[in-house]
Amino acid sequence: MLVAVLDANVLFPMLLRDTLLRVAAAGCFRAHWSARILEEMTRNLLSDYGMEPSRAEALRIVIEEAFPDASVEGWEELEPDMRNDPKDRHVVAAAVAAGATVIVTSNIRDFSNVPDGIVAMTPDEFLSKIFAKDPTAVLEAITAQAAAYRRPALTTRELIERLALTSPGFAEQALEALDDR
């Protein structure tokens, strides 16, 4: 199974975060992060997205409880050996500690010098890769995601169209597959 570390910046946008986590919960890949990544997510939800502190903390707890094995330990001692951008070395160290082959990030440029066997991918590239492997499971996860939304209610098509903002290639593939159903 594909093992990926999710950078904090792919956990900020609600629809993208929810999609990645639901696809992971469907067994399409194994998601990992570190406590520091979740702290960065929480901090940015407060400062950039204006989320109330209690809601941001509740979200972090829900994520941790939904994925109890996702938190990576032992990355701290690896961080000094990483050679990518200093502010994102902790993400690469978490990937090494998790045995991940992929880092999913919206900030590819800071991951140009990572250890062999690890590749940084945008959410669009990553979701497209996952979709190519198991389109049925991904579409089922997205359909369940759309069905869970109430305010506003979204159809599967509408959800995929909104995902096109962060993942246009994936959205195009998913819409084509949806039309073929």
Identify what each model region corresponds to:
Residues 30, 71, 117-119:
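Conserved beta-strand segments of alpha/beta enzyme cores
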Residues 9-10, 36, 109, 125:
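Alpha-helix/helix-capping structural signal
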Residues 89-121:
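Acidic, metal-binding active-site segment of PIN/NYN-like and related structure-specific nucleases
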Residues 32-75, 142-167:
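PIN-domain endoribonuclease scaffold, especially VapC-family toxins
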Residues 3, 14-48:
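PIN/NYN-family metal-dependent endoribonuclease catalytic core
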